[in-house]
Amino acid sequence: MSIALAGVVTSCDMDAPTQSTLDETSVFSQYSLAESEIMSIHVSFCQTNSYRGRFLPYYGLNSDLETGSGTQPSYSKAMSYDDKNSLWAYNTLATNGQMNTDNNAYAMFYEGIERANLAIQGIRKYGHIENNRDMAQLLGEALTLRALIYNDLIKAWGDVPARLQPNNADNVYMPRCNRDSIYKVLLADLKEAEDYCYWPNENVITKSTERVSKSFVKGLRARIALYAGGYGLRGDGYRKSKDPELASDKMYAIAKQECVDIINQHCNTLGSFEENFKKLCQDNVAAGGESLWEIPFASGRGRVVYTYGIKHQAADQYTSQNQGGANGPLPYLYYDYDKDDIRRDITCIPYEWSKDLVDGKSYQQLRGINKWCFGKYRYEWMKSERALSLGKNDDGVNWQYMRLADVYLMAAEAINALDNDQQTAWKYMKPVLDRALPAAKVEALKAKYTANQEAFFNGIVEQRGFEFAGEMLRKADLVRWGIIDEKMAEAKQKLTDLSNRAGSYKDLPLKLYYKNEGENIVIYGLNHGDTDAEGAALDGYSSKQWFVDSKTGANLLTEDYINGLYVGKPSLNCLWPIWQTFIEKSNGLLNNDGNYGQLSD
């Protein structure tokens, strides 16, 4: 048997893996060679059209928090099936030009699954895991990475073929499989993997967030349980599973236990909100902090800052790339935060770095109300020797797949839903809020959220939004909660109100007032209650029309923008079709009939 080997690396290395004629026995009985097989799974994450350039930039848009900022929502473009807009606007065709290729994310995910299948089979046969903890760790990693990929396949495509054995003559063509069956395999696999994987820093292998630890295995199992027990689009409509083994209470019980286990182990700690993202941008992969696992992009791969970072209009003192700002927050998100919430000014950024350079340096300048950037990922937070030597497109910053704040909030959600115990649930929400808000405001939220079960659930919905905006968890959360239609309609109304400075946004000034202090911009007019009279009286400040085009007077948040957020009913269009190229090569076993080809039972 020919085994594909990749170099032993801790990040995705995009050099083509070498081919070896070593037999399966030799590869999977030696730790270093078996480890190479685990690393080869990472390569599939990082291919050009896999997570790097297709799944991470597009899955998760549009939500009630996140949208395109470079290419913006557009009803007219979505209705004419513009490739990018229709991917976001809940009306995607199987022939989409961004996706309908043989090397797209759908194919790369199955490539990663095949590599995981080979590793799982080989290590089980020849790894002697009962006598070798490190080989057992590798088996746990393979099981976990396969579960991760399958979970993302289901999020995007729903019922998909279940390839759980290496490819052979008997499984070349496979139909869709009910996702419930896959979920049950994943939950069982992850339970097994828990027995194999080390806790963070328990072993040299798990000293890095680029390697799977028991904390991540448990966290992923909790996340998958919440998806399995929640709503999704099926062949007969948008509903929860009918399988009693995946009943919501059973899935919440799994999520509760797994999350509480992670927290009680004390192997991971919450630092400050900003610290987490600075460490991410600086390639600090030391385990034990907030990060549980990251997609390990190599220095020459990955478009995290390119896609989700603050826009730089030119190569400047911080980066050799004129990138960033492709995706950003919906314009109202900034105004929905409490003004004292430290997450607001880290998550939502109204400025960019200038194209014009002064003494070779750019400076911050206002963008537009329809062009906000995310601020969790920044070239200016990267190590300068790295950021100033980047190629045209890739920045090499890892994608943080899960962090400890998610574990705390999943625990809080599960305890509220399962036990109807708001006081205990609050104990798991509180650490996330303590680092974000002043103590008095945390206490006020406690009174609001712990009033009853519904109030606490609404608090979870609200705080997961404020905590994870820009991390692309929101769309899947809205789907599993069964509220995606409600929240997306609310998003359109909020955009309409913001455009007209009405409703919750009626107390905002028409203009923003700003000045530069060195390279940094100082802005007045972004807080509720700020006024144009006060702004105009500020010494040394310039002003900019924020809501309307300064030349035409037309609203920048146009009807085309607002209605472009979604054009199909979100709950019935929350999946992508399997791309046409794969349908045509499926020997008639795959289709997108009905609700995107989904099964009813």
Regions found by a protein language model. Give the residues of each.
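Bacterial Sec-dependent N-terminal signal peptides
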Residues: 1-20, 477-480
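Long, intrinsically disordered, low-complexity segments
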Residues: 12-14, 109-112, 187, 208, ...
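An aromatic- and glycine-enriched ligand-binding surface/loop that stacks and positions planar moieties
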Residues: 13-81, 160, 183, 187, ...
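Conserved, well-structured interaction surfaces
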Residues: 30-31, 35-36, 43-49, 75-157, ...
